[in-house]
Amino acid sequence: WIMGHMVNSIAQIDEFVNLGANSIETDVSFDKQANPEYTYHGIPCDCGRNCLKWEYFNDFVKGLRRATTPGDSKYREKLVLVVFDLKTGSLYDNQAYDAGTKLAKNLLQHYWNNGNNGGRAYIVLSIPNLNHYKLIAGFKDTLKNEGHEDLLGKVGHDFSGNDDIPDVEEAYKKAGVTGHVWQSDGITNCFPRTLKRVRLAIANRDSGNGIINKVYYWTVDKRSTTRDSLDAGVDGIMTNYPDVIADVLSESAYKNKYKIATYEDNPWETFKA
């Protein structure tokens, strides 16, 4: 999965897919009542990027729906996965459940079109704080209560705080999550970071008894780091330059080992070579 980083305006969806992304990451900020409000990152953000692009969350999600609904004039077949980077740092811990509820209602209406030919992309809910695990329950309970439990088949999870893997597993246990787990590792492109924790996450993924299904590394903008990540065995790379990742994937060392994921590739299944 080539994951376009910080895609927060509708125009950027096309921009990143045109560069080779089959997945995007979108920042979601919340208001004081735990409603998803804007797709917005703000300052500081990655070096070399405009941090200030934004939409109202509802508007972005409607644009995203069009980009991922077959038959729509804006449909982009290649875009199959969306990571919502949930900026829950502005919320109190006891608002996490509410945030999950409100996010689910919003996506149900504006993305899934109440289950009536909505967007088809797989969605990863990425939470920065392990203490906010109740957001997952709020989200799941709401879809069940609204009669759309089937849509949970399209939803996966990530804790993005670079916590120790056993602590992440513990949070999932509390949240009742047993699958659909992506594990991120990384740092802003302004600083280097070793692949040490990525390798631990990959070991968990491949152990057969860990909780992790997929591992992605962020934010990777250089060819050398891309190669190191692929050599380590990641499933996804988050980047400001999807064309760089696509270029490296076409090199002889990688083109027979990796393929760019399509809608037919299940993002919740651990890949066995």
Curated annotation (Swiss-Prot):
InterPro entries in the cross-refs: PLC-like_Pdiesterase_TIM-brl (IPR017946)
Record carries keyword Transmembrane: no
The entry's keywords: Cytolysis, Dermonecrotic toxin, Disulfide bond, Hemolysis, Lipid degradation, Lipid metabolism, Lyase, Magnesium, Metal-binding, Secreted, Toxin
Subcellular location: Secreted
Catalytic residues in the record: 5, 41
Tissue specificity comment: Expressed by the venom gland.
UniProt binding sites for Mg(2+): 25, 27, 85
Disulfide bonds: 45-51, 47-190
Matching CDD domains: GDPD_like_SMaseD_PLD (cd08576)
Main location, first listed in the record: secreted
GO molecular function (one): phosphoric diester hydrolase activity
Function: Dermonecrotic toxins cleave the phosphodiester linkage between the phosphate and headgroup of certain phospholipids (sphingolipid and lysolipid substrates), forming an alcohol (often choline) and a cyclic phosphate. This toxin acts on sphingomyelin (SM). It may also act on ceramide phosphoethanolamine (CPE), lysophosphatidylcholine (LPC) and lysophosphatidylethanolamine (LPE), but not on lysophosphatidylserine (LPS), and lysophosphatidylglycerol (LPG). It acts by transphosphatidylation, releasing exclusively cyclic phosphate products as second products.
Family: Belongs to the arthropod phospholipase D family. Class II subfamily.
Listed name of the protein: Dermonecrotic toxin LruSicTox-alphaIC1d
Species of origin: Loxosceles rufescens
